[in-house]
């Protein structure tokens, strides 16, 4: 299992690398660290696809294609977030943990990892805006304030993640998988699809 320092390094190094090189993954992750990495890549893809949706003057057909990609990447993000929890709970299970009587944490490890992944992307792109020489006056200063807030929030969350894992290992706290159960990618759960007239 990764501690928060290793996790943040994995997020940040990959965020920088993937802006230059598109990664290739060999199938579905079979271990915790691989799940963390692929989950971060799903957020990376989602971030940049959402940017495309906000481009002024984009055609309707382009927005429709982007929306479908956003749904796909978001589903992937959530599936991998849950897989992070599966691997973490399997590791705890080797020691007959978590204990059923331990207080339940309101957020799972995977949900916290997802939030840290998004913060890594926010920090990278905020730093980019600080460094952008074509930006108007005051832009860099405003983004320096944002960056300080983002780093502070990420530090707090990283400490909380380490504490949750340590307390789970000690049997003093537990977490469980909170399934997202997204409905929009399931045709049988979308009335706009199952009530739509059939086309010839």
Give residue ranges: language-model regions.
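Anionic, Ser/Thr-rich low-complexity intrinsically disordered regions
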Residues: 1-200
């Amino acid at each position: 299992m990764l501690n928060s320092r290793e996790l943040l390094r994995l997020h940040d190094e990959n965020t920088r690398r993937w802006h230059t090189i598109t990664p290739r993954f060999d199938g579905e992750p079979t271990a915790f660290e691989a799940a963390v990495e692929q989950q971060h890549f799903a957020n990376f893809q989602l971030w940049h696809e959402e940017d495309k949706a906000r481009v002024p003057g984009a055609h309707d057909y382009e927005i429709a294609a982007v929306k479908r990609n956003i749904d796909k990447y978001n589903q992937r993000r959530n599936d991998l977030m849950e897989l992070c929890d599966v691997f973490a709970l399997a590791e705890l299970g080797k020691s007959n943990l978590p204990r059923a009587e331990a207080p339940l944490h309101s957020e799972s490890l995977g949900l916290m990892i997802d939030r840290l992944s998004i913060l890594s992307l926010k920090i990278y792109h905020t730093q980019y805006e600080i460094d952008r020489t074509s930006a108007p006056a005051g832009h860099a200063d405003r983004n320096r304030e944002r960056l300080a807030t983002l780093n502070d929030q990420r530090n707090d969350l990283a400490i909380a993640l380490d504490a949750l894992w340590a307390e789970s290992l000690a049997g003093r706290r537990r977490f469980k998988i909170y399934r997202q159960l997204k409905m929009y990618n399931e045709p049988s759960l979308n009335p706009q699809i199952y009530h739509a007239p059939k086309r010839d």
